[in-house]
């Protein structure tokens, strides 16, 4: 599978990801600095969507997994084994320099029941009582669950996310023996603390100028998580480490599809 996408038209229209033909797309980098005249730098980049390549992608996937989980959590699991599982599962990577180059982004749907004895599945089951209960329910039913793993370099544009998900979901259905999708999805992601200064409260406002104190709020590393969280059946956060907060969400199929649709609409509204 190869889907060639040029970043420029992702900003101009929604992409029908089920088209087999290449799509020519160009966009303005949303994070590029404007010069004194207000002009924006235009960056044209070709993004190619490939299936996971075991002969090329292994080490890059391990690095992206380490970025996703953070070093401390990554040390609690066998990343090499997890990378192998990802490369055996429906996985889409995004590259800019051909199939033999390192991926800048990946999305994988790992079948929980197929890999329930894996180190990663056991890690998730033991992570929180809510997940333990959820997986026990899946184990004792005919329902299916995919463990979603998705990470990208920080400068990857969010516009690639809807086609990335739609392509991979289509691959899952196409490669399934019954042509069906998964019933549930567990998404592991993260947020980060945004620090800011604020005025401290004082009972006597006339006594002294109010002090500036540090506050913080949370924002998303992955913009799609903002929309997924709205539809999550289970959603909770892990302990904060160095300003990074793990995020865990369980969605049903309808919720996942709707969240990606909402992201597409949000992206279209930015233009």
Swiss-Prot record:
One of its GO terms (molecular function) is protein folding chaperone. Residues 1-37 are annotated as: Disordered. It comes from the Eukaryota. Pfam families: BCCIP. GO terms for biological process: protein export from nucleus; ribosomal large subunit export from nucleus. InterPro entries: BCP1_family (IPR025602). The keyword Cytoplasm applies. Belongs to the BCP1 family. Keywords: Cytoplasm, Nucleus, Protein transport, Transport. It is found in: Cytoplasm; Nucleus. This is Protein BCP1. Involved in nuclear export, actin cytoskeleton organization and vesicular transport. GO terms for cellular component: cytoplasm; nucleus.
């Amino acid at each position: 599978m190869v889907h060639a996408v040029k970043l420029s038209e992702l900003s101009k229209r929604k992409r029908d990801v089920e088209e087999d033909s290449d799509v020519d797309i160009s966009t303005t980098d949303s994070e590029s600095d404007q010069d004194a005249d207000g002009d924006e730098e235009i960056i044209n980049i070709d993004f190619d969507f490939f299936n996971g390549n075991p002969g090329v992608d292994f080490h890059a996937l391990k690095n992206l997994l380490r970025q996703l989980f953070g070093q401390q959590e990554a040390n609690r699991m066998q990343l090499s084994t997890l990378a192998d599982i990802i490369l055996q599962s429906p996985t889409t990577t995004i590259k800019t320099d051909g199939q033999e180059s390192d991926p800048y982004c990946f999305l994988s749907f790992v079948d929980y029941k197929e890999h329930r004895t894996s180190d990663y599945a056991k890690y998730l089951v033991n992570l929180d009582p809510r997940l333990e209960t959820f997986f026990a329910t899946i184990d004792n039913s005919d329902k299916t669950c995919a463990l979603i793993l998705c990470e990208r370099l920080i400068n990857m544009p969010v516009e690639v996310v809807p086609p990335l998900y739609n392509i991979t979901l289509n691959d899952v259905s196409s490669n399934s023996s019954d042509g069906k999708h998964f019933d549930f999805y567990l998404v592991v992601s993260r947020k980060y603390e945004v620090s800011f200064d604020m005025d401290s409260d004082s009972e006597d406002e006339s006594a002294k100028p109010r002090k500036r104190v540090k506050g913080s709020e949370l924002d998303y590393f992955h913009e799609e998580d903002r929309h997924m969280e709205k539809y999550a059946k289970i959603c909770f956060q892990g302990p904060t480490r160095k300003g990074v907060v793990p995020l865990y969400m369980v969605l049903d199929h309808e919720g996942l599809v709707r969240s990606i649709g909402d992201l597409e609409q949000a992206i279209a509204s930015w233009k």
